[in-house]
Regions:
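A short alpha-helical cap/connector motif
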Residues: 1-121, 131-176
Length: 176
């Protein structure tokens, strides 16, 4: 569990990357500004995550907003089902190529190759805990460097990967 003190230090170190500053691509800026760093209370927030700790609630709300934007039919996730279903009522959970949420422990080479083989240009991958250990950091750097990935966002608590090859490969650090 990350302490509140460390949370503030992370936030201060990343404050230059707040609210999309430095992002030149209009699509990427819009994603950061209106999905990642959206601060409006959505209609479902009042009934979601009351018993969750702050990080689970923060990530759950992020996945809610991503799901609300993407409207996927199938999501691959072992957790956060309430948040995802609140954003998209008809969503199913299982093996997906649209929206995949995995913990860093499941990011071994074989798992990533399987994911890379099934994703398309509109797919989104979220890797949780990208800074939890030295090995997690290395895996995240490998994902960023992989030629099969496109635009990546480092939110400290998780990393978001897009696979659209029509866009320039970019890596953004975002104060989330």
């Amino acid at each position: 569990m990350i302490s509140r003190y460390k949370t503030w230090l992370v936030w201060l170190r990343r404050c230059a990357h707040s609210r999309g500053f430095g992002i030149q691509s209009p699509i990427d800026y819009e994603f950061v500004r209106y999905v990642v760093n959206e601060h409006w209370d959505y209609y479902a927030y009042s009934r979601l995550g009351k018993e969750d700790d702050w990080l689970h609630r923060k990530l759950g709300r992020l996945y809610f907003r991503i799901t609300n934007r993407l409207q996927p039919t199938v999501v691959e996730s072992s957790d956060y089902h309430n948040y995802i279903r609140a954003a998209c009522r008809n969503v199913r959970f299982g093996d997906s190529s649209e929206f995949i949420i995995i913990p860093h422990e499941r990011c071994d080479r074989a798992s990533l190759d399987a994911i890379y083989n099934k994703v398309g240009e509109s797919s989104v991958l979220v890797v949780e805990g990208i800074y939890e250990s030295g090995e997690a950091k290395k895996r995240w750097r490998d994902i960023i460097a992989d030629a099969r990935t496109g635009v990546t966002f480092d939110l400290y608590y998780c990393g978001i990967v897009f696979f659209d090859k029509k866009r320039y490969k970019q890596h953004y650090i975002v104060n989330f």
